[in-house]
Amino acid sequence: MYAMAKNNILGCVDKVPDELWSYQPTPEVRSFAQLFAHVADAQYLFCGVAAEGKSVSKGIEKSLKTKAEIVPALKEAVAYCDSAYAKMTDANAAEMVSLFNMRVTKLGVMDFNIAHTMEHYGNLVTYMRLKGIVPPSSTPPPPAASKKK
């Protein structure tokens, strides 16, 4: 599930052109740029708690504004989480950590990361549809190479 969530987010990055990164459907909601930056920050928060027992703060949403700045930060955040997921074992998944003043398992934190990422993927899908862009999860796969006999 994590691979699907991260691939959907990274797929959006590729599909949303630079000129739309400041787009927000209403003034009360985040722009494309703010959503991508928020997801990057959240990767550090959740995977930091699961991997290091503490939230890691990068301040991406507050400090980075452009696609050129946010994309590398998002990719680094995803790589950080890739490492955290790779280190998850049956034994350490059940270890308890603190998240939002609650005691939860490390696996619970990682599951919450997936849910949070997909929540914001849903926001991105709506924004993309409003701009006539087909989101990654609705894009048909490329045709398979035909086999010659």
Where are these regions (language model features)?
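Alpha-helical packing segments of well-folded alpha/beta enzyme cores
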Residues: 1, 5-12, 42, 70-84, ...
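Short, contiguous alpha-helical
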Residues: 7-10, 20-59, 98-149
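Acidic/histidine-rich alpha-helical segments that form the ligand environment
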Residues: 65-98, 105-121
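Generic structural signal for well-ordered secondary structure
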Residues: 28, 39-40, 63, 67, ...
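Carbohydrate-interacting regions of secretory-pathway proteins
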Residues: 3-7, 63, 67, 72, ...
